[in-house]
From Swiss-Prot:
The active site is at 233 (proton donor), 259 (lowers pka of active site tyr). Short chain dehydrogenase; part of the gene cluster that mediates the biosynthesis of sirodesmin PL, an epipolythiodioxopiperazine (ETP) characterized by a disulfide bridged cyclic dipeptide and that acts as a phytotoxin which is involved in the blackleg didease of canola. SirD catalyzes the O-prenylation of L-tyrosine (L-Tyr) in the presence of dimethylallyl diphosphate (DMAPP) to yield 4-O-dimethylallyl-L-Tyr, and therefore represents probably the first pathway-specific enzyme in the biosynthesis of sirodesmin PL. It holds the Pfam family PRISE. The gene is sirQ. Keywords: NADP, Oxidoreductase, Virulence. The keyword Oxidoreductase applies. One of its GO terms (molecular function) is oxidoreductase activity. This is Short chain dehydrogenase sirQ. It comes from the Eukaryota. Belongs to the short-chain dehydrogenases/reductases (SDR) family. Highly divergent. SUPFAM superfamilies: NAD(P)-binding Rossmann-fold domains. The keyword NADP applies. PANTHER family: 3-OXO-DELTA(4,5)-STEROID 5-BETA-REDUCTASE, NAD-DEPENDENT EPIMERASE_DEHYDRATASE DOMAIN-CONTAINING PROTEIN.
Amino acid sequence: MAVAVVFGASGISGWGITKALLDAKTQNAFSKIIALTNRSLSLAESGLPDDDRLQLHSGIDLQANVDDVIAKLRERIPSIGNVTHVFYTAFSTSHTDNQLMMKASNTKMLRTMVEAMETVAPSLSFIAVQTGSNHYGILFAEVLGERFGPVPLKEDLPRLPSPLRDSLMFYAMADEMDELSRGKSWKWCDIRPDMIVGYLPRPNSHSIAESIGYYLAFHAYLTPGEEVPFPGSEAAWNAKFSLTGQGVLGNFNVHLACKNSIENGEAFNIANKPFTTWASLWPLLAGYWGLKGTAPVGHHGIPDAASWVLDNMDRVKGWEEKYSMKPGRLFKIPWRYFHWALNMPFDRYLDLTRCEQTGFQQHEEHKESFETAWKCMQEAKLLPIVDKSSTPP
């Protein structure tokens, strides 16, 4: 029976894949799921179910040399030699904004993982590598102008022109996998989600569900039942986009792993369907917290959510105590990412034809993805369970 290993299991993608692998529908597909993290993480802290098939291990640093990684895998994980399927979601992005440095670091980590797993797991047959929609240059869309797209963004779009293409780590990672897989008995695929909406046990620099959840939940505490204007720009308010629910992403990874018909190196977009706009979505998200979501207040939206939090710093402790929340999380929110995500003024939704042609038919509304993530955060005491009829504090 198949044995899976997930690299980056404490991240938003890896956590979702691990949970999907543990789901009852896949119980007969994988006899063991090995979830790997760099930093120490207990099962209780992880929020993953207590399942005999799950092995949670930490301290596997892919920035070390490959011989050290091989030695640690063999020393700490006796069952690593039985692995047949790898799900790779480990990224190093938080230490720098330099795209060239990120490309070099992440490409090296990927090569180290592949060379290590080839050595320790002779039955290796499949590697799913997560990249993302920035393969299409979303980061540079405003620079590209009319050269961006066209939308919907399809997997076979040509790469960006130089010098922009030279800084994108996803191109380098795909080229690395093509080289490493040449002539091998295993296949790999390139999975490209858009911005991922989901839960994760630790603060993350790219968690849009957490930042929007805290923004709205704290608003609901300060001004319950009132209007909350969209904090992004007017241009972003009507731009069409698609986000990717964590559960959809996890289930699609498992779906591909259980198929034998994909081509080596094939790329797949995966996202919620249909696409949406903040004009449609923001009122629904605000409504979850008993608020009335409205259009942005000005051309450029609210300038700085972090400053707004600091301006209300004296109210945070009372908010956390009222709802028995874990303290201090609000001050760790990546507001820069929140600001960027809510101010993209261009259409950028993904084409999902290819993923549907594999037989994958799970669709999820964007509102549902946020609510699923928020309920997990509420259970973990990260967000409050709000009485929407409450009076102002």
